[in-house]
């Protein structure tokens, strides 16, 4: 029986939860250890986590859960077209440039060369971004298209999988497919199935005997959340907090006088992560040269 087309499965105008997954070509461990050479490619799982964080800041799509394994990837995603409706044209344009900056960067490089040749002023170079955004905002047909894309799970998967494939091929100095297909997906119809899917995704490393317990899974959303809570408890209460029971730790987090400090810590962690990702951004974008609309 043929799979249901994505055009039927995904309703861009309606919020929904979807389980999306993809495998490396021939199910090879391209994000794990090469058993022939002994070389580890586990750092590519960090690429996936970092890229997801970057894309989540642009798309109107919630990354509810994810798991990066040696040879495949699981995501639990929720599209939010209702959020896109609240954004004005400038925010839509800014978000799209964040996701696909290559065309703007190309214009900026052209203007920089013209500036070096003395053909234009420094002011003209500084205005390139603003003019580029205004051109996008003045094209209402383009804006309608971009609004659809910003809550389109297919576009998030495209920009995720293409990015990882390009980086991996460049690292291996090869060409060709990295993923066996675009991706596969199932719609989650109720809360019970959403919870079951979340458990399935986060317990993948335990089931595969890569980890003994969920908190040891460094490339799952649950593992990252637990590590964040652990770091927060250490920051606020000190090392003794880690020797208490789970109930005691929950009570610590719930203490009214601690919430503000905990929130400040989490905000600082998010800012540090964003600075780290933005620090990588120029080199990564130059390498990948993603084209909007391709």
Language-model region placement:
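Short catalytic/metal-binding and nucleic-acid-binding patches
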Residues: 1-294
